[in-house]
Regions:
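BTB/POZ-protein C-terminal extensions
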Residues: 1-17, 21-110
Length: 110
């Protein structure tokens, strides 16, 4: 396969599998320090996170939703998002809900 996935996401998911809460926190903190991540890597890593964490573990998932929303200009220019959305997964419904909430928050500020 050889596709790039963010290392801290893999570490977080392994820590989830083995119940290592401190390692999960560290991996999530380190993940938040990264910048300039290509859109395709973000989406692949988000898909990996969704495939390897339970629905009840929202920390890593929320991180990816926020990252996609913050990077929305990049995703608008990228054909990667359209292709991924056509494949469909729970990630995209969660993203829709998160973006609606984000828009509601912006509306309330005005």
């Amino acid at each position: 396969m050889g596709e790039v996935i963010l290392r801290d996401t893999v570490v977080y998911c392994a820590a989830e599998q083995y119940g290592l809460e401190d390692l999960k926190r560290l991996a999530l903190r380190k993940q938040g320090l990264q910048i300039g991540i290509p859109a395709d890597v973000i989406l692949r890593s988000a898909r990996f996170a969704y495939d390897n964490t339970p629905d009840s573990d929202s920390r890593l998932r929320a991180h990816y939703l926020a990252l996609i929303i913050r990077s929305r200009k990049t995703f608008k220019r990228s054909g990667t998002m359209q292709m991924e959305m056509e494949l469909g997964s729970k990630l995209y419904f969660d993203l829709f809900v998160a973006m609606c909430n984000h828009m509601d928050d912006l509306t309330e500020i005005r």
